[in-house]
């Protein structure tokens, strides 16, 4: 779990997302409260439940990006789902319980990686010895007992040195690796049958888990495979499951996007299997229930839920009252201005202009954007959003792709050249398309 303070979390989010201070503060406080709760003693700790968040704002202002960045900062089980993918229990489609199953799978992967990292040093030593055994099989006497001579030991040390320096990386050897490592069985689940598919997959994996298979591979690949193999042997599967379930129950975060799309519209009274029914199915998860997963029973009482939606057609009050009550913190994200677009193009880490500069640099082309050019690009994107559909910052991708079209196509023939993109260049590339509303609608 992350131990970052709210100020540090907001500072980290500021490197990637422009504006939306209220939303950043809300998620930063929610994330820090997870850590604060874990410092409490029982039974008070059990009584402190997370305050779920509802983020409201037009498309393309940073709701989903906040979730993506939060996932990396949280260092906790995290899953992002689309509310529109689920249907009411009893109908064809995914049930909402699969959210918790997927979250538990995510936790298993996270905890497994953490455990492998803890045991990596020991696993590396054993893997190195197995590689050396394959390169220099120990000499045996007539009774089949291993003999250990000094000369053999000195040769082994010489090979160990070469192995560590990478001199043997491309040499091929034959090694025994666990069949489970090399033969992953993946089964695609039809809608509504995820549980049965999980059981089948576990069965196939268990069948090959104790078997080994001879494989011929390069030493650098063999070393990685053997390290994973040895690290996996040092992990207790039952302990791993329990740690993963604890991580989900105490620190899990679920981000539900497009929640406005499952609001009931108007007085429509027909079958609504993917709207109000889904909201009612979500209720037990959000307020706390027990979900059966292939790893064990998971309680959802202390999982943090963050929901988001544009609410352009529906309103938050169109959610069923019970669900509204389970999302007590409301955060409104504001629409982006031309000045915000200008900042988005230059300020964030790995901004769009930096990405295009780096891409063209691979062809030996140096790209420079003037301040006037950046301002004009931002204004063009903002104007197209006003004239047509407002898709927020996503419009910048379309405008930039149009602007860079000629350079991207000819870059391979421009090695060593420098291209200065100024206001005149932007006007020439985008002018007609931006001014003509019909062209904007179809091209940008």
Curated annotation (Swiss-Prot):
Chaperone keyword on record: yes
Cellular component annotations (GO), alphabetically ordered: HslUV protease complex
GO annotation terms (biological process): protein unfolding; proteolysis involved in protein catabolic process
Family, similarity comment: Belongs to the ClpX chaperone family. HslU subfamily.
Signal peptide: none
Subcellular compartments: Cytoplasm
Job description of the protein: ATPase subunit of a proteasome-like degradation complex; this subunit has chaperone activity. The binding of ATP and its subsequent hydrolysis by HslU are essential for unfolding of protein substrates subsequently hydrolyzed by HslV. HslU recognizes the N-terminal part of its protein substrates and unfolds these before they are guided to HslV for hydrolysis.
Complex formation: A double ring-shaped homohexamer of HslV is capped on each side by a ring-shaped HslU homohexamer. The assembly of the HslU/HslV complex is dependent on binding of ATP.
Chain positions recorded as ATP binding sites: 18, 60-65, 257, 306-309, 322, 394
Pfam families reported in the protein's UniProt record: AAA, AAA_2
Region (Disordered): 143-163
Organism: Haemophilus influenzae (strain ATCC 51907 / DSM 11121 / KW20 / Rd)
Record-linked InterPro entries: AAA+_ATPase, ATP-dep_Clp_protease_ClpX, ATPase_AAA_core, Clp_ATPase_C, HslU, P-loop_NTPase
GO molecular function: ATP binding; ATP hydrolysis activity; peptidase activity; proteasome-activating activity
Gene3D superfamilies xrefs: 1.10.8.60, P-loop containing nucleotide triphosphate hydrolases (3.40.50.300)
First-listed, main subcellular location of the protein, grouped into a coarse class: cytoplasm
Alphabetic keyword roster: ATP-binding, Chaperone, Cytoplasm, Nucleotide-binding
Protein name, per record: ATP-dependent protease ATPase subunit HslU
Keyword Chaperone (UniProt): yes
């Amino acid at each position: 779990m992350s131990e970052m303070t709210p100020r540090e979390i907001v500072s980290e989010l500021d490197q990637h997302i422009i504006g939306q201070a209220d939303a950043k503060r809300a998620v930063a406080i929610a994330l820090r409260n997870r850590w604060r709760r874990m410092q409490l003693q029982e039974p008070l700790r059990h009584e402190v439940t997370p305050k779920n968040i509802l983020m409201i704002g037009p498309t393309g202002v940073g709701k989903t990006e906040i979730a993506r960045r939060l996932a990396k900062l949280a260092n906790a089980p995290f899953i992002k789902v689309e509310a529109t993918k689920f249907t009411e229990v009893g109908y064809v489609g995914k049930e909402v319980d699969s959210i918790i199953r997927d979250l538990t799978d995510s936790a298993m992967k996270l905890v497994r990686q953490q455990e492998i990292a803890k045991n990596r040093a020991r696993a590396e030593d054993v893997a190195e010895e197995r590689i050396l055994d394959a390169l220099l099989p120990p000499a045996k006497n007539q009774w089949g007992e291993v003999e250990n001579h000094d000369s053999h030991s000195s040769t082994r040390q010489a090979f160990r040195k070469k192995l560590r320096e990478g001199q043997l990386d491309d040499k091929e050897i034959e090694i025994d690796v666990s069949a489970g490592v090399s033969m992953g069985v993946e089964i695609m689940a039809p809608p509504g049958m995820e549980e049965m598919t999980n059981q089948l997959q576990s069965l196939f994996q268990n069948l090959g888990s104790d078997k080994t298979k001879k494989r011929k591979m390069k030493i650098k690949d063999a070393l990685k495979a053997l390290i994973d193999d040895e690290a996996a042997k040092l992990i207790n599967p039952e302990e791993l499951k329990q740690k993963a379930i604890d991580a989900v129950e105490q620190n899990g975060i679920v981000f539900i996007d497009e929640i406005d799309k499952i609001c009931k519209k108007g007085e429509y009274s027909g079958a609504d299997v993917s709207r109000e029914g889904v909201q009612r199915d979500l209720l037990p998860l959000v307020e706390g229930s027990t979900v059966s997963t292939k790893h064990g029973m998971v309680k959802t009482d202390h999982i943090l839920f963050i929901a988001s939606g544009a609410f352009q057609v529906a309103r938050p009050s169109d959610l069923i009252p019970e669900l509204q009550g389970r999302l007590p913190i409301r955060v409104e994200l504001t629409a982006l201005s031309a000045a915000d677009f200008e900042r988005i193009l230059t300020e964030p880490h790995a901004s769009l202009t930096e990405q295009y500069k780096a891409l063209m640099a691979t062809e030996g082309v140096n790209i420079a954007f003037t301040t006037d050019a950046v301002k004009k690009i931002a204004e063009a994107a903002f104007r197209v959003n006003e004239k047509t559909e407002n898709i927020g910052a996503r419009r910048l991708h379309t405008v930039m792709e149009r602007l860079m079209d000629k350079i991207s196509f000819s870059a391979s023939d421009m090695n060593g050249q420098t291209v200065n993109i100024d206001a005149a260049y932007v006007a020439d590339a985008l002018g007609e398309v931006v001014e003509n509303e019909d062209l904007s609608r179809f091209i940008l």
